[in-house]
């Protein structure tokens, strides 16, 4: 063992020496971030109708136009106008995972958020405690309970804002003490656990909590004994139950008269506000009449599905404040309780009860009979009913939320909030290119990376290409007609994007194969007709999926005691595949049970690499990437979140896996979901964690946060477009973001020693303005790219008066731009204009007067066709008011001293002069030859 450690130490020392020699930027992290990274902006492009899981809604009792919407992994949103617009108000906190949001009844500017989603599924986002705002969500303070991770309910005392109760489920994947009910008497400065439930030494969480509106010292709590494992889920136990306190939590009594005993799962509670003696509970009864307690308990502890029928989800009612209960429903109501388990009583009629699951069920006779409440939603998690008008509802579900004013007969889905939960993303090579994303419970979607002209990207611009839950997808880079996409458990399809025909192509000859919930596959970079698909073996097709062959043995640990959990999340499966783009036949795979293997002969022989990885956690392999630049080089990441280990695990090999070097280095304690290597700069790497994006420009020696205007959000996938040099970010809760990273690709030591540096300028198409479809006002506006080229430049030292950039058409000076002079990287956009005639003194004086008095109105540009370039030599102004399309004002279109004309497509020179030295780049403006496509 000592010799092995010595070997790794020598490797690490050699690697560090090599990094020091080739290090690109000798800056500390803060300096690099402030001088460079802050200038990289992300464009949020949506989509919106294809939303994400909404789990909590808090409506002001003083003004129902004001409410807060909590998305499981997608943060917190606020409206003050009944949903016409929403503002994201939780973008920069430590987590985006929302468990519950509530308003202080005494002061609605006081908002409490329990973080960490309480719906127990494989992609649920954890939190970091409880937050408080005293200004309606403008600012937040973390008030502790950081290790609870998942909070099911928060209740504020109706007369005393300092008293708050929290129902904490605790960590999902391990036992921890931070489970139970907590109480604060000082507004969150300190907390005391007031209900602790244990089974032997195991702590049991609390998932629901309700308060008697007559007496705030009376509370009911639902405990939930459960734990998730990487291979399955133990969803019930003997310590799940309902507890009551009548003295604010000093003493609790477990309620039992009329309630089931034995093995119980998740419990949802509801109290009728007009008569709080009436309570409802929906209880998952996991007992089986055909099995003994011990037999069933062993199955649950081993995360195995029940071998015999269980009782199911039963509704109970109490009419005497929980002293006695009776079974209200005759049979099973609702679906998977761990993912739902919500029961709601109409605030104005105690006989009307709703249960949320895949659908919404309703009983109008106090739970005796049940029917479908309405045909809307899907995988429903929260239902708010207006206490003064039961017709007014807000429903939250897996793809967003909606409002009804007629008890659910008709709904309005909110299309102005971007909440898409992406598992995987990709792109095509069309021009402009499209992005593709596989979404939680909403299939696979395709949308534009940009819009021609300057209009925003709307939800109408997105196309649904596959149903189910959406995961990995690939587009043939030589012919975007062929799209391969996938639903859960490896359900692979080939889509003909020309005809719309879809053909299922998943390998089915071997029924014993195991496919992961999110099964990886790829198209060979050497031949896109070749597909590699991961099960517990690696599959290969040489003819676009029409026939398959198994090219490996079982590449997992194949632990039969763990394969197949209670929710059928297949375990012992391949979770990552990489192919060398430099050498055909070199394939890498990683599995969910920690194996890393390589073949160099297209599957003829395989080698297990686990022992070569120093301090190998043998966790779930989240990503494997083969280098674009060096033979034998690959990157490997593990995620430990399935074992409650949140440290980053990241490795690099340069010798086909014989040796590995840890390169997580200064990355914070956040699990890594994805790593990408830049296709131009081998030392430029990006990782996506459960919180944000990080970048290194020295091959992993130092990492820098690249959050900027990106919200705190889990990053499940990253892609780099090889032609456009765009970093495409797939978030699990906020859709797509795109950033131009081309300047990062150029950064090197020589650059930084210069007084200044002008980066290469990306070509820009001068798009013909298309006609715009009429869309609803209440619609999300995805950010389009700037219509003119962005000019980036570096300054070694600051220039207080800024810099001037001169633009030339060949040798002719045509325009001048004013740019910032900050130390580090700067940028300015050229609006594709040139100077026209000089303004008269009278016009300048009029301008100055209007500016001084505030009378000057914003200037807008009107144009919508390419006709102004039809006549050779024609000079076209940018004030064509006779044309029909108005687009927003942008700097540089109008000046104090000059009128401006629009330039024609061509090659222009951009010159910046610093300390008597000129720096020059070409700016290629392309004609729109695609306008009629």
Language model segments and positions:
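Short beta-strand elements
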Residues: 917-932
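Glycine-centered tight-turn motifs at strand-turn-strand junctions
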Residues: 617, 813-902
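Bacterial N-terminal signal peptides
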Residues: 14-26
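Beta-strand-rich binding/interaction modules
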Residues: 493-495, 789-792, 798-816, 907-911
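Bacterial N-terminal signal peptides that target proteins for export
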Residues: 2-16
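Beta-propeller blade termini and top-face loops
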Residues: 30-779, 786-787, 798
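Short acidic/polar inter-strand loop motif in beta-rich domains
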Residues: 836-839, 913-921
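Contiguous beta-strand segments within globular domains
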Residues: 770-802, 808, 825-829
């Amino acid at each position: 063992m000592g010799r092995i450690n010595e070997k790794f130490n020598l490797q690490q020392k050699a690697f560090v020496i090599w990094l020091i020699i080739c290090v690109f930027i000798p800056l500390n992290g803060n300096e690099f971030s402030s001088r460079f990274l802050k200038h990289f902006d992300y464009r949020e492009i949506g989509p919106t109708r294809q939303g994400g899981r909404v789990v909590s809604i808090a409506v002001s009792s003083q003004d129902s136009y004001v409410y807060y919407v909590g998305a499981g992994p997608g943060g917190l949103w606020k409206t003050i106008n009944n949903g016409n617009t929403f503002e994201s108000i939780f973008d920069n906190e430590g987590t985006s995972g929302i468990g519950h949001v509530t308003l202080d009844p005494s002061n609605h500017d006081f908002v409490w958020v329990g973080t960490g989603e309480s719906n127990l599924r494989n992609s649920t986002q954890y939190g970091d405690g409880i937050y408080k705002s005293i200004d309606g969500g403008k600012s937040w303070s973390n008030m502790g309970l950081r290790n609870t991770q998942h909070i099911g309910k928060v209740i504020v005392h109706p007369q005393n804002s300092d008293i708050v109760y929290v129902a904490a489920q605790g960590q999902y994947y391990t036992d921890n003490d931070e489970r139970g009910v907590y109480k604060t008497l000082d507004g969150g400065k300190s907390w005391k656990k007031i209900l602790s439930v244990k089974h032997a030494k195991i702590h049991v969480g609390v998932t629901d909590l309700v308060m008697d509106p007559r007496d705030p010292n009376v509370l009911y709590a639902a405990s939930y004994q459960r734990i998730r494992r990487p291979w399955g889920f133990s969803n019930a136990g003997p310590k799940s139950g309902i507890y009551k306190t009548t003295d604010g939590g000093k003493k609790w009594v477990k309620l039992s008269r009329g309630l089931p005993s034995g093995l119980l799962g998740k419990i949802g509670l509801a109290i009728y506000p007009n008569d709080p003696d009436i309570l409802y509970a929906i209880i998952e009864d996991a007992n089986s009449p055909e099995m003994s307690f011990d037999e069933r308990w062993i199955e649950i502890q081993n995360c195995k599905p029940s071998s015999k029928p269980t009782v199911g989800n039963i509704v109970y009612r109490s009419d005497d404040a929980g002293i006695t209960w009776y079974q209200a429903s005759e049979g099973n109501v609702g679906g998977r309780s761990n993912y739902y388990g919500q029961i709601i009583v109409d605030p104005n009629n105690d006989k009307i009860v709703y249960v949320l699951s895949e659908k919404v069920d309703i009983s109008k006779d106090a739970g005796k009979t049940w029917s479908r409440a309405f045909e809307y939603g899907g995988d429903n998690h929260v239902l708010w009913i207006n206490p003064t008008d039961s017709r007014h509802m807000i429903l939250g579900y897996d793809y967003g939320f909606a409002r009804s004013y007629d008890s659910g007969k008709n709904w309005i889905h909110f299309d102005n909030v971007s909440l898409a939960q992406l598992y995987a993303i990709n792109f095509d090579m069309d021009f402009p290119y499209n992005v593709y994303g596989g979404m939680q419970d909403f299939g696979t979607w395709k949308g534009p990376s940009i819009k021609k002209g300057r209009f925003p990207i709307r939800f109408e611009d997105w196309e649904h290409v596959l149903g189910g839950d959406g995961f990995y997808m690939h587009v043939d880079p030589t012919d975007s007609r062929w799209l391969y996409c996938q639903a859960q458990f490896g359900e692979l399809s080939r889509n003909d994007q020309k005809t719309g025909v879809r053909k299922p192509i998943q390998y089915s000859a071997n029924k014993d194969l195991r496919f992961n919930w999110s099964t990886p596959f790829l198209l060979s970079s050497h031949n896109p007709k070749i597909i590699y698909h991961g099960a517990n073996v690696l599959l290969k097709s040489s003819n676009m999926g029409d026939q398959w062959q198994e090219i490996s043995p079982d590449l997992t640990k194949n632990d039969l005691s763990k394969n197949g959990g209670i929710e059928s999340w297949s375990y012992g499966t391949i979770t990552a595949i990489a192919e060398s783009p430099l050498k055909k036949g070199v394939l890498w795979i990683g599995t969910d049970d920690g194996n890393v293997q390589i073949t160099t002969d297209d599957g003829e022989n395989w080698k297990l690499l686990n022992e070569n990885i120093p301090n190998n956690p043998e966790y779930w392999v989240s990503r494997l990437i083969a280098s674009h630049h060096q033979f034998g080089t690959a990157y490997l990441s593990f995620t430990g979140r399935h074992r409650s280990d949140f440290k980053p695990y990241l490795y690099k090999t340069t010798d086909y896996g014989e040796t590995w070097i840890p390169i997580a280095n200064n990355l914070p304690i956040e699990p890594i979901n994805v790593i990408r290597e830049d296709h131009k700069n081998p030392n430029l790497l990006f990782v996506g964690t459960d919180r944000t994006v990080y970048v290194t420009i020295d091959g992993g020696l130092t990492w820098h946060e690249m959050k900027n205007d990106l919200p705190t959000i889990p990053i499940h996938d990253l892609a780099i477009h090889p032609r456009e040099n765009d970093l495409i970010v797939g978030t699990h809760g906020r859709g797509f973001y795109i950033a131009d990273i081309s300047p990062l690709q150029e950064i090197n030591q020589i650059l930084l020693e210069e007084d200044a540096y002008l980066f290469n300028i990306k070509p820009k198409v001068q798009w013909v303005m298309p006609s715009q479809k009429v869309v609803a006002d209440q619609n999300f506006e995805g950010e389009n790219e700037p219509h003119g080229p962005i000019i980036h430049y570096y300054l070694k030292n600051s220039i207080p008066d800024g810099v001037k950039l001169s633009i030339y058409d060949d040798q002719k000076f045509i325009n001048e731009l004013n740019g910032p002079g900050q130390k580090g990287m700067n940028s300015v956009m050229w609006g594709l204009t040139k100077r026209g005639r000089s303004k008269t003194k009278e016009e300048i004086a009029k301008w100055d007067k209007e500016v001084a008095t505030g009378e000057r109105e914003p200037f807008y540009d009107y144009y919508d066709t390419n006709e102004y370039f039809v006549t050779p030599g024609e000079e076209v102004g940018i004030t064509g008011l006779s044309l029909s399309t108005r687009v927003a004002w942008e700097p540089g279109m109008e000046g104090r001293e000059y009128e401006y004309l629009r330039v024609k497509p061509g090659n222009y020179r951009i010159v910046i002069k610093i300390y008597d030295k000129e720096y020059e780049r070409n700016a290629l403006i392309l004609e729109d030859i695609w306008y009629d496509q």
